């Protein structure tokens, strides 16, 4: 009999998506969120990693990763490039140099058909990206890390069929983590390979957690509350010493990264266990987890609706709509940005999901 799926893991994915959007919204606690929120996704991917030592299994795994990660990366960045000139007319992007007065912003020029073709070729090999697709760095990193881990796993099982691969994978993860830390200090991250070296250890950490097992589901409530409180305290204690910016492969040190990531996992897992006991909340988080890719792709664009409404009410130059990632800070603006960044991609995802279900149903009857 198959082991029942842990509903908390579905909730964890949804919580991670909420934290990602919240971290981009101008929320005052973003530094705390950045300690662990992206590491959580690498660890979840490692937790669910499963592959036999057969060549066919490796091919299936690679094809699934291409369809689930590489293709959305290319299509999303290409779509944003195709829409570039339209976005310029709508002030979603701008060529006005005054935008440079706002930190982290850039001037954008019009593109030609030749530009679109050339840039799409670059997206195909993970060379660069678009501003509105800025969160897709994670998709690139996860694609590279998961394929590398699978190739190493396949090679180890072929070379040493009688031995457990966990120890050599752990040794490689440790070596790559050291390399990743050195790359971060040197500012080297060509094709995101510095991130790959650092993130490999987080992927392995997820595999290790799966192997060791989660706490018993019938664990006492006081024990779970204590674990969550301790994890929260550890993260608070780490906060004065720095934060984690995996998008740029920046973190204070390898031990800091591992401790923050592990503490974040414990905190989010215990929160997810609580959420899983509340059917409505659990369903909402599971829906967000299923829509993870649309949210990653569309939440920056969705923020523009909040900025546009703010400009209509408060007034301001049209070019300010292009402020990235958000125009307004302070007050409850972060709440409005977060709501838009979650709700609009989720709504946009529903027609695709329904169409896919109908197609699969028709194919099933054929």
Where do the model's predicted regions map?
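Alpha-helical transmembrane segments and their immediate juxtamembrane cytosolic regions
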Residues: 1-366
């Amino acid at each position: 009999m198959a082991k029942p799926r842990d509903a908390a893991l579905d909730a964890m994915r949804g919580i991670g998506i909420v934290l990602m959007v919240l971290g981009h919204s101008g929320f005052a606690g973003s530094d705390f969120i950045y300690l662990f929120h992206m590491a959580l996704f690498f660890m979840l991917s490692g937790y669910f990693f499963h592959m036999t030592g057969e060549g066919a299994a490796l091919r299936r795994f690679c094809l699934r990763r291409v369809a689930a990660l590489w293709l959305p990366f290319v299509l999303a960045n290409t779509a944003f490039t195709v829409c570039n000139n339209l976005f310029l007319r709508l002030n979603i992007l701008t060529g006005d140099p005054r935008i440079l007065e706002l930190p982290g912003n850039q001037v954008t020029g019009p593109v030609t058909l030749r530009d679109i073709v050339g840039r799409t070729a670059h997206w195909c090999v993970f060379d660069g990206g678009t501003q509105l697709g800025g969160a897709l760095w994670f998709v690139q990193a996860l694609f590279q890390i998961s394929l590398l881990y699978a190739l190493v796993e396949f090679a180890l099982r072929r070379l040493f069929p009688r031995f457990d691969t966990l120890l050599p994978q752990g040794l490689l993860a440790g070596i790559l983590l050291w390399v990743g830390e050195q790359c971060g200090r040197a500012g080297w991250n060509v094709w995101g390979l510095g991130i790959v070296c650092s993130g490999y250890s987080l992927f392995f950490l997820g595999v290790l957690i799966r192997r060791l097992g989660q706490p018993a589901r019938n664990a006492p409530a006081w024990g779970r509350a204590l674990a969550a409180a301790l994890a929260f305290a550890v993260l608070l204690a780490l906060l004065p010493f720095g934060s984690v910016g995996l998008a740029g492969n920046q973190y204070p040190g390898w031990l800091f990264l591992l401790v923050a990531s592990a503490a974040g996992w414990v905190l989010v897992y215990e929160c997810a266990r609580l959420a899983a006991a509340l059917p409505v909340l659990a369903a909402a988080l599971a829906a967000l987890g299923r829509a993870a890719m649309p949210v990653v792709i569309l939440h920056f664009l969705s923020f523009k609706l909040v900025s546009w409404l703010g400009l209509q009410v408060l007034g301001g130059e049209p070019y300010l709509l292009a402020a990235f990632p958000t125009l307004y800070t302070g007050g409850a603006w972060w709440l409005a940005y977060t709501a838009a960044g979650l709700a609009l991609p989720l709504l946009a995802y529903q027609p695709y999901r329904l169409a896919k279900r109908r197609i699969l149903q028709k194919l099933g009857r054929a």
